[in-house]
Amino acid sequence: MSRLAGGAIALAAAGVGALGMAWWSRPATAPLSLPAPRAEVPATTIGSYGTRVSYPAGREPSLAAPGGTPLLVHSLLRVDRPMHFGDYVWNESGVPAEGDTRIRVDLSRQLMSVFRGGHEIGTAVILYGTDHKPTPTGTFPILARARLHQSTLYDAEMPYMLRLTNDGVAIHASAVRRGYATHGCVGIPEDFARRVFGTSARGDLVTITA
């Protein structure tokens, strides 16, 4: 289950515009590192995107959350095709409508995963910061939300903004293209950002790992 056919990145604005062309290599991503469910537990079909991999009660893996409570995973989306810059998958079929929303960002794999009640409902290829403007790691509560935020620091629009730090690091919609990076924010495709914005709330936890 490969979720990205890799590439290089270059500097782009914290919003959606380009600021420069400094090129270097970054690793390609890989799927979430979780144990496979027992063979006798079949995957459940959940719609046009394929199947959901479910874990039996008592055998669910957990994902560490530095500075926060580990996330117990009940099911994952099965993504059988490579994901490229700008790609995302969103599928809530078969997932309870109630449950805490948790967001995980894996910088090394360039992936975001959105969970509700321990079930993965969305995943996307992301942009993140440069060595000079890195994306911070740790677990952060969502401090503020704005459907359309105008950055005064970079004079750029940041649609569907979820602010994570007091110095302006946020998740927001961006042009997720090969060769682009951010000034420390997490950039995600706009339609995916709209869905994340709609399912998240102030105080929900976002874990970012290197």
Give the positions of each predicted feature.
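Exported/periplasmic cell-wall-interacting domains
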Residues: S2-T51, R78-V79, G86-D100, K133-T139, ...
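N-terminal, Lys/Arg-enriched amphipathic/low-complexity engagement segments
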Residues: I46-A64, L72-V73
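Short, compositionally biased leader-like segments
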Residues: S62-D87
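Short, surface-exposed loop motifs enriched in S/T, G, D/E and P with embedded aromatic residues
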Residues: L71, V125-I126, I142
